[in-house]
A protein has these predicted regions:
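Intrinsically disordered, low-complexity terminal/linker regions enriched in Pro/Ser/Gly
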Residues: 29-64, 163, 183-193, 200-209, ...
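Acidic, small/polar-enriched beta strand-loop surface segments
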Residues: 88, 118-208, 220-249, 255-261, ...
Length: 289
């Protein structure tokens, strides 16, 4: 009920990406993990294919979903997982890889298309494309909120593989030194060899990076048009001269709000701030493994 006594209907829901939330990553019969090696795009699409498009159990298949052609974007990498939520895992891989992903509607073929998104570099530091700058000076953002956190920051990890006590295999990732060196122990006991141990260690060390988050309400019809000049996954320049903040950040989250009084956008630039739910999920993943 609104302040003037009128009834209001509030509708909230996920985009088509919510389909991936309905599936876990189930290893093949006789396998402890679903292992994926290749480009980071290939890895993301393998997990999606194995659990939505062509799963072993036909009851898990979602016939409406297809996967776009693999362009093998991203670096060569290796990931393994078991019984983790599909959407959470491919989001983790995508964030580590500086990629994105989406599921869009193909109206001509009545299909939902899963694809990886690379995003465009629209910062002021490049000259190939017209730059996109979000700033109060451009009158295209308001209600801004900036957080820079080093509370959980670590840059050197001692990664523990298989074995116990002095027989346990330990490898280091990260090369910082002196006062700037922040160390952490990383449990990688699932790794089968040194190569996988280091790869897994680098993935987990990324959880301890510096958090730079800029949240703002974006004016959708300002100097830069949403969906035309910029979109989710693009890297843009965010600036607030009063705060002395200038960031080249990826647009990691967009919330579209449709109300009686118009259309609004809320955007997150940079790393999301970990919530208590995120931390609980990480503990739960350790239990599953």
């Amino acid at each position: 009920m609104s302040e003037d006594g009128k009834e209001q209907l509030v509708i909230k829901g996920p985009t088509l990406k919510g389909i991936a939330k309905r599936r876990l990553i189930i290893p093949s019969i006789g396998q402890g993990y679903d292992n994926a090696i290749g480009s980071q795009e290939t890895i993301i699409k393998q997990f999606t294919n194995n659990n939505i498009v062509n799963p072993v159990d036909v009851n898990r298949k979602i016939p409406q979903v297809i996967i776009a052609k693999d362009k093998q974007r991203g670096k060569q990498d290796a990931w393994r997982t078991r019984y983790e939520n599909l959407a959470d895992k491919i989001t983790e891989i995508a964030e580590y890889s500086n990629l994105g992903w989406d599921i869009t509607l193909d109206t001509n073929n009545n299909k939902f298309v899963f694809d990886v998104i690379e995003g465009k570099n629209l910062t002021v530091d490049q000259e190939l494309l017209p730059p996109v700058i979000f700033s109060v000076d451009f009158d295209n953002i308001k209600n801004k909120h900036f957080v820079k956190s080093l509370l959980n920051y670590k840059n050197v990890g001692y990664c523990g593989g298989k074995g116990e006590d002095e027989e346990r295999l330990i490898q280091q990732v990260g090369e910082a030194k002196g006062l700037s060196r922040n160390e952490v122990f990383i449990d990688c006991s699932q790794a089968d060899d040194i190569s996988e141990l280091k790869s897994m260690g680098n993935h987990k060390l990324d959880d301890f990076k510096i958090v730079n988050t800029f949240e703002a309400q974006v004016i959708p019809y300002g100097a830069f048009i949403y969906g035309q000049d910029w979109d989710l996954g693009d890297i843009v320049t965010v600036q607030d001269k009063k705060w002395g903040v200038t960031l080249n950040s990826r647009i990691t989250e967009i919330k579209e709000i449709y109300e009686v009084n118009g259309f609004n956008l809320e955007c997150v630039f940079g790393n999301s701030i970990p919530t208590i739910i995120d931390k609980i999920k990480k503990v739960s993943k350790k239990d599953v493994r």
